[in-house]
UniProtKB/Swiss-Prot annotation:
Residues 139-160 have a biased composition (Basic and acidic residues). DNA-dependent RNA polymerase catalyzes the transcription of DNA into RNA using the four ribonucleoside triphosphates as substrates. Specific peripheric component of RNA polymerase III which synthesizes small RNAs, such as 5S rRNA and tRNAs. Widely expressed. Expressed in CD4-positive T cells. One of its GO terms (cellular component) is RNA polymerase III complex. This is DNA-directed RNA polymerase III subunit RPC7-like. Keywords: Disease variant, Dwarfism, Nucleus. Residues 161-193, 201-218 have a biased composition (Acidic residues). One of its GO terms (biological process) is transcription by RNA polymerase III. InterPro entries: RNA_pol_III_Rpc31 (IPR024661). Belongs to the eukaryotic RPC7 RNA polymerase subunit family. The gene is POLR3GL. Component of the RNA polymerase III (Pol III) complex consisting of 17 subunits. Pol III exists as two alternative complexes defined by the mutually exclusive incorporation of subunit POLR3G/RPC7alpha or POLR3GL/RPC7beta. Found in a trimeric complex with POLR3C/RPC3 and POLR3F/RPC6. Directly interacts with POLR3C.
Length: 218
């Protein structure tokens, strides 16, 4: 005969794991479900070793902080971009970003670097200041007469100077002409001396005595 329950689930359900291993005894009610999130950091079972204190550790820490600050000030340090606004403005195009400003502040020894890498900074042109000069009063008739007299005196002085220069030039030209004439006369005398021949070949010597000679001379 089959059992009354027939093995079809009419009996009490059994747990698949041992409840006593979790810390719950027989007959104890299960704890209610927790509706709060779990803690972010569970309690530490093992605490870290305390940091070594002393002059050497403080010196190394100061060097590390100094190196970190120097690296952030270099031009190739990438900084986070500034978040853009929802509404773009016209002036935002002409505002320079942070890394470019930092690169301009960097002043290395350019004698060791090629000229092509040197950064050219545009200098702002200074606004021209217009200076208003006081207006000159209009010239009167007396001032005009004085200026005319000054001009006349200057013209007379110029004429005197030009006349003296002309006289000096004429004297120099006369001297040059006289020197040229003397030189031409000397050349003419030398030429006539060369033209006149003073050479005697002796053909006319003894012309009268040839008639009285009986024998021929070879």
């Amino acid at each position: 005969m089959a059992s009354r329950g027939g093995g079809r689930g009419r009996g009490r359900g059994q747990l698949t794991f041992n409840v006593e291993a979790v810390g719950i005894g027989k007959g104890d009610a299960l704890p209610p479900p927790t509706l709060q999130p779990s803690p972010l950091f569970p309690p530490l079972e093992f605490r870290p070793v305390p940091l070594p204190s002393g002059e050497e550790g403080e010196y190394v820490l100061a060097l590390k902080q100094e190196l970190r600050g120097a690296m952030r000030q270099l031009p190739y340090f990438i900084r986070p971009a500034v978040p853009k606004r929802d509404v773009e403005r016209y002036s935002d195009k002409y505002q320079m970003s942070g890394p470019i400003d930092n690169a301009i502040d960097w002043n290395p020894d350019w004698r060791r670097l090629p000229r092509e890498l040197k950064i050219r900074v545009r200098k702002l042109q200074k606004e021209r200041i217009t200076i208003l000069l006081p207006k000159r009063p209009p010239k009167t008739t007396e001032d005009k007469e004085e200026t005319i007299q000054k001009l006349e005196t200057l013209e007379k002085k110029e004429e005197e100077v030009t006349s003296e220069e002309d006289e000096e030039k004429e004297e120099e030209e006369e001297k040059e002409e006289e020197e040229e004439e003397e030189y031409d006369e000397e050349e003419h005398e030398e030429e006539t001396d060369y033209i006149m021949s003073y050479f005697d070949n002796g053909e006319d010597f003894g012309g009268d005595s040839d008639d009285n000679m009986d024998e021929a001379i070879y």
